[in-house]
Amino acid sequence: YSHLKGNFGTAWQNQQKEFAELPAPVLFTTNCLMPPKPSYMDRVFTTGTVTFPGTVHINEEKDFTPVIQRALELGGYQEDQHFTGINGGTSVTTGFSHGTILGVADQVIDAVKAGAIRHFFLVAGCDGARSGRNYYTDFVKQSPSDSVILTLACGKYRFNDLDLGTIGGLPRLMDMGQCNDAYGAIK
């Protein structure tokens, strides 16, 4: 659904704060839904395996009309907003999946054969909400420039706003989704 895409906010533990003032609907497609506060419950939509009492669930026909109508009603921010990630970055690398990665498999294989990509690292855990829990951030910052970082789970929010550049024409950071998307990374 190319017309429904995006990533707003950081890790799951910040949802209740970050969604409180968001003038837009939020569609949850995977796990990590915190109980919505009444102030934004009418902006939360779910689909697939995730659901929550009191929210509108988009069924298997995937008719997103209620989400689109709510977006039009809310209108979004009146002025451009400036958001930063945990490291101060203003853009994040997100939105890959096993299908996307498999779609560029030839390009990855060519980059490996050419020696451009020599390492793959999978960050598949959570750094947690407390400051000082920076294991994955430090790991990624210290990764060699000839490595690709694949992510699963909320640990990515500790570093997905870092500019790691590209390698072999591909971004060095490829987000494979949440914990429950692990099967795709294995493919």
PLM features per residue range, with description:
Residues 1-187:
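Metallocofactor- and cofactor-centric catalytic cores in central/energy metabolism, strongly enriched
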